């Protein structure tokens, strides 16, 4: 897997990331939650001999990327009835389609919990298929075989508790997102992929520590922003743009 570094790489599919992956011998690139506007980037990957499959849930532009396949419910020619899947929901659909009807139930049982967490964390419209994904995924979270997820639940104080979408949004998601915000995005992925219980415990503790660091940085930025507002004369407050060279890019965005 490759997760773009928020500060160094920016968001979405980037040429530097494509070149790096090509150098590692990657010949098939599957995007998740990005790439629908990456026409030039996908063309660049093609020029390097890479096949690209784009999965995304953002609105399409007039020109689609020249990928082998573009999976997005917002495609003008897509007849899929539910248009509000999260990026992880679209990825789940691809997994189910590739697995075939005979494996659909097994794959859904394994991956629905991760899709539920992603859907709730992305604050998607909680209706129709999203509601089904979240309801089923959270109902089976205690039976999930993802060791890293159980380690994170334990470290977050949610072991042996009924996990709701609210707890996903305010407890689990901030810890998972903290890795990317603080410049260590791979840590969250490594945790979810981890098969060693001891390493999973270590990564979960590190992730929670990063989240506490993120909270402290965020609070400091907030205090400085309030100070800037208070120093601005009332007659100049009709519209305010606050900035500082010292504010952490991963936290303000």
Q: Which ranges hold each PLM region?
A:
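Hydrophobic, small-residue-rich alpha-helical packing segments that form membrane-like cores
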Residues: 1-90, 107-109
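Hydrophobic helix-and-loop "lid/oligomerization" segment in the mid-to-C-terminal part
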Residues: 1-28, 48-49, 66, 100-253
